[in-house]
Amino acid sequence: MLNRVRSAVAHLVSSGGAPPPRPKSPDLPNAASAPPAAAPEAPRSPPAKAGSGSATPAKAVEARASFSRPTFLQLSPGGLRRADDHAGRAVQSPPDTGRRLPWSTGYAEVINAGKSRHNEDQACCEVVYVEGRRSVTGVPREPSRGQGLCFYYWGLFDGHAGGGAAEMASRLLHRHIREQLKDLVEILQDPSPPPLCLPTTPGTPDSSDPSHLLGPQSCWSSQKEVSHESLVVGAVENAFQLMDEQMARERRGHQVEGGCCALVVIYLLGKVYVANAGDSRAIIVRNGEIIPMSREFTPETERQRLQLLGFLKPELLGSEFTHLEFPRRVLPKELGQRMLYRDQNMTGWAYKKIELEDLRFPLVCGEGKKARVMATIGVTRGLGDHSLKVCSSTLPIKPFLSCFPEVRVYDLTQYEHCPDDVLVLGTDGLWDVTTDCEVAATVDRVLSAYEPNDHSRYTALAQALVLGARGTPRDRGWRLPNNKLGSGDDISVFVIPLGGPGSYS
């Protein structure tokens, strides 16, 4: 049997079947993502081999290409098979012998307990160099690496309905961010307020001075102050939108199935930017204090936004859904009765007379992890999902899903950080079974067992967090020490020391 499998795999390789084309990089003509001294980006861990010789070459190649793990894990083919084992659920981390991640970042992940065929989480950790695109003064110049900026980048992407969107975002989102920052290189390095407009040709008057424009001067007596920080936030928001648009364009040609939640951290010029679209979360643990750096975006947390859209555009609901929320599904026998409800403007509840339209399925239903939009999806922000439709219907769900992240900023220069101060990023596989306080307790317990200058301490912490959420196999399932069910989802965790590269790298 083994020989037949080997023969089949050899036949597939020799048949010359090519994997689907890779999505285009937004960074043409220059696609490098690191300074000249940095090593070029390596290919991702090799895809898993096909397990059957009966599949056609095209299908087998597609199956192999559909599973990959982050490059920095440096997995061998055998390690890749162990990472894909639902029974053992071995925790994966970068090898001790390999090059450390930037900032001595810790990382660990584990596959789900059978929820999906492969691990649909993806991760990325990069040092990205940004070349300026133009001079703010309007004088064209050639890009110079000496005048650029570097930013540190971490990303967790929790895929659903397939891993294609998460894999694509993990390879390209940081490049979209870099592209958006190119116009800001000189502006961010200049302490003066940002110009209102960027000149397009030499000699164009500075648009921050409106004296060259016609009209009453009184209308220019006041101008909003825009901070450098808000420019970076806007660049990140635009990058998320452009990434989502690229997925829409290329989803068929590149097998970008499903969608993904995206949690991204950027360190630039002394500040940490945390951008979240989905139900992954990030917290800072600083001297025992817990500082939330993101929040979940679910049908419950965004109920009013969803209901408002359904109210303003009822055609998106068809004749199947109502934008109103009721404590439970309305029954036909309750027509004419007064029942509790709430609409897009309400945080409380009131009574209304039940009408025929109220018998439709509610746009937002369920609660907690069972809350759904249009009875289909449990997250309301993320990337992808352009082909997602209501079951047995042609109604698209994408209009209700936002690709824009919420961005929170943390100024590292405002505090004196010790080696035990960390930023913890985790997909929902961690947070579904672990509270913020439990994470903080694990941070204290694990880091206290290591010397402050031991670079492996943050990887050990990431592993402990993943193991704590996964549990141990017992009673036909994965159980926590309190005998509650462990997380059966994919779990991915970054631990970023807030001391930065100068102290710990």
Curated annotation (Swiss-Prot):
Residues 104-498 form the PPM-type phosphatase domain. Residues 27-50 have a biased composition (Low complexity). The modification Phosphoserine is found at S66, S76. It catalyses: O-phospho-L-seryl-[protein] + H2O = L-seryl-[protein] + phosphate; O-phospho-L-threonyl-[protein] + H2O = L-threonyl-[protein] + phosphate. Belongs to the PP2C family. One of its GO terms (biological process) is signal transduction. InterPro entries: PP2C, PPM-type-like_dom_sf, PPM-type_phosphatase-like_dom. Residues 1-103 are annotated as: Disordered. CDD domains: PP2Cc. It comes from Homo sapiens. The gene is PPM1J. This is Protein phosphatase 1J.
